[in-house]
Amino acid sequence: MCIRDRFLAVPTQNLASFCKENKSFLTDRPLIACCKGVDQATGLRPSEILSEHSSKIAVMSGPSFAVDISKGMPTALVLASAEPGFLRKLQSDISMHNFRLYRTSDVVGVELGGALKNIIAIACGIAIGAKQGDSARAALMTRGFSEMVAFAQAHGAKEKTLTGLSGLGDLSLTCNSEKSRNFVFGVSLGCQKPFNKNTTVEGVATAFAVSQKARSLGLEMPITSSVSALVEGSASIEEVINSLLSRPTKEE
């Protein structure tokens, strides 16, 4: 790994300001985004924000918790970049025995998989917190994944990417673990208990940004819209549950 490579694990909502404040440190350097989200103010993905500072950009995402990686536990992630040579070198330099990296050119798919699963994790947490049961969680994960695929494909992503580590893999981990900040935040919402406001919950801002974009594209994303409405306080848990359960049945 070259010392010139910059790995950015800054929360997505702070990435633009961080880059502006550290412009001299980042300009024309290889940049690797490790954050998962969509900027609420601009609707931009991390790679789009970084593209203003460098032409050599990659994103790294997938099912992982920092604490597991720090302990050397087996982890598999995905690296994505539009630069094949840069991508292969990164994969070779970073991969280790317990840290496997796969590669793809589908930057959009990798980024949106990592961003959108946070919204669904909040929804699953709400279901568990509101004591709706594991069957409800499974339904939210499955239908939520359909929303993820539809939104990502509308932005040019490949369905194959969403069924891989950065999409389905990350969704499975985040919706089923109390290590997930987004899931735990959802649980707090569901049981109406306070949540540590100093904790980063990327899914909140992402839900707002994605809901707005989905409306402009004419995409139906009821789970995402419900999370957005709940977080902004325009709907109650009871109203959201009733709304989702009263949707017309259709072919899967």
Segments the model singles out, each with a brief description of its role:
Residues 1:
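Nucleotide/phosphate-binding catalytic cleft detector across ATP-hydrolyzing
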Residues 4-74, 90-92:
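Rossmann-like NAD(P)(H) cofactor-binding subdomain of soluble oxidoreductases
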Residues 9-10, 37, 81, 176, ...:
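Conserved residues at beta->alpha junctions
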Residues 10-13, 17, 41, 45, ...:
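Conserved active-site and cofactor/substrate-binding residues in soluble primary-metabolism enzymes
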Residues 14, 25, 49-57, 74-161:
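Internal alpha-helical scaffold of NAD(P)-dependent oxidoreductase catalytic cores
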Residues 33, 56-61, 101-105, 164, ...:
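General beta-strand structural signal in soluble alpha/beta enzymes
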Residues 36-38, 61-67, 83, 105-110, ...:
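Glycine-rich beta-alpha junction loops
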Residues 124-128, 153-163, 169-252:
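NAD(P)-dependent Rossmann-like dehydrogenase/reductase catalytic/cofactor-binding core
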